């Protein structure tokens, strides 16, 4: 299978994602520059963490208008798998591909730590190798990770199984302790924590590896974990 990793000016987690997919999981991976058109043939597109366009205006606000995002939107609306990690999550909300928004952390400080996450929905292309209710440890590094959404949309997301990960110890004030969500079609997913930073035994934590293995399992035709 073939993964595409979008690189914006200011991206800094693209290499980590590439390394995990290429060297740890032996997948075909290609970088996609923000000024390029999105080519055909990708099985999954990843928007990595970082500070796209310097986070000017607000996180993800400029990146959503990049040339490559035109293709990403078409790809997503056609059912293609799209993942946004940290800044990538912010971009997906700004682009309207995911509900809600990411704003300043409640404590108004940048947080860099490892935090417990609860897998709240295992029936998705991104979590099918986890067990529902499983608690994992994943690094976070963000200043604007406070997820906000209106009560009506939140209720709909809960009903439709769109909340995939919640914080065990809410570090940023996110509504409903939300750490990761997907769209109604379950093909577009965003999360603030960094699974790519917990996918190699050398780092002492492989809890994030099953995130990428879930995508691979789904693309190979495997069933989601009910």
Swiss-Prot record:
Its EC number is 6.3.5.3, 3.5.1.2. Residues 2-225 form the Glutamine amidotransferase type-1 domain. Disulfide bonds: none annotated. It comes from Alkaliphilus metalliredigens (strain QYMF). Part of the FGAM synthase complex composed of 1 PurL, 1 PurQ and 2 PurS subunits. Keywords: ATP-binding, Cytoplasm, Glutamine amidotransferase, Hydrolase, Ligase, Nucleotide-binding, Purine biosynthesis. Pathway: Purine metabolism; IMP biosynthesis via de novo pathway; 5-amino-1-(5-phospho-D-ribosyl)imidazole from N(2)-formyl-N(1)-(5-phospho-D-ribosyl)glycinamide: step 1/2. Part of the phosphoribosylformylglycinamidine synthase complex involved in the purines biosynthetic pathway. Catalyzes the ATP-dependent conversion of formylglycinamide ribonucleotide (FGAR) and glutamine to yield formylglycinamidine ribonucleotide (FGAM) and glutamate. The FGAM synthase complex is composed of three subunits. PurQ produces an ammonia molecule by converting glutamine to glutamate. PurL transfers the ammonia molecule to FGAR to form FGAM in an ATP-dependent manner. It catalyses: N(2)-formyl-N(1)-(5-phospho-beta-D-ribosyl)glycinamide + L-glutamine + ATP + H2O = 2-formamido-N(1)-(5-O-phospho-beta-D-ribosyl)acetamidine + L-glutamate + ADP + phosphate + H(+); L-glutamine + H2O = L-glutamate + NH4(+). GO terms for molecular function: ATP binding; glutaminase activity; phosphoribosylformylglycinamidine synthase activity. It is found in: Cytoplasm. This is Phosphoribosylformylglycinamidine synthase subunit PurQ. GO terms for cellular component: cytoplasm.
């Amino acid at each position: 299978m073939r993964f595409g990793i979008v690189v914006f000016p200011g991206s800094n987690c693209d290499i980590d994602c590439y390394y995990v997919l290429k060297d740890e999981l032996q997948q075909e991976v290609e970088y996609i520059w923000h000024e390029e058109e999105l080519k055909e043939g990708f099985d999954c597109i990843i928007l990595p963490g970082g500070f796209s366009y310097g986070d000017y205006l607000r996180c993800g606000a400029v990146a959503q208008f990049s040339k490559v995002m035109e293709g990403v939107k078409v790809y997503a609306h056609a059912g293609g798998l799209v993942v946004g990690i940290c800044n990538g999550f912010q971009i997906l909300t700004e682009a309207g591909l995911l509900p809600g928004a990411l704003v300043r952390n409640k404590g108004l400080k940048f947080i860099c730590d490892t935090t417990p996450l609860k897998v709240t929905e295992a029936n998705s292309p991104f979590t099918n190798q986890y067990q529902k209710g499983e608690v994992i440890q994943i690094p976070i590094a963000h200043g604007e990770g406070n997820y906000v959404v209106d009560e009506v949309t939140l209720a709909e997301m809960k009903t439709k199984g769109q909340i995939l990960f919640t914080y065990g110890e809410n570090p940023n004030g996110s509504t409903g302790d939300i750490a990761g969500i997907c769209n109604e079609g379950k093909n577009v997913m965003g999360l603030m924590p960094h699974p790519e930073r917990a996918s190699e035994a050398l780092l002492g934590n492989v809890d994030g590896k099953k995130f990428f293995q879930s995508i691979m399992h789904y693309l190979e035709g495997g069933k989601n974990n009910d």
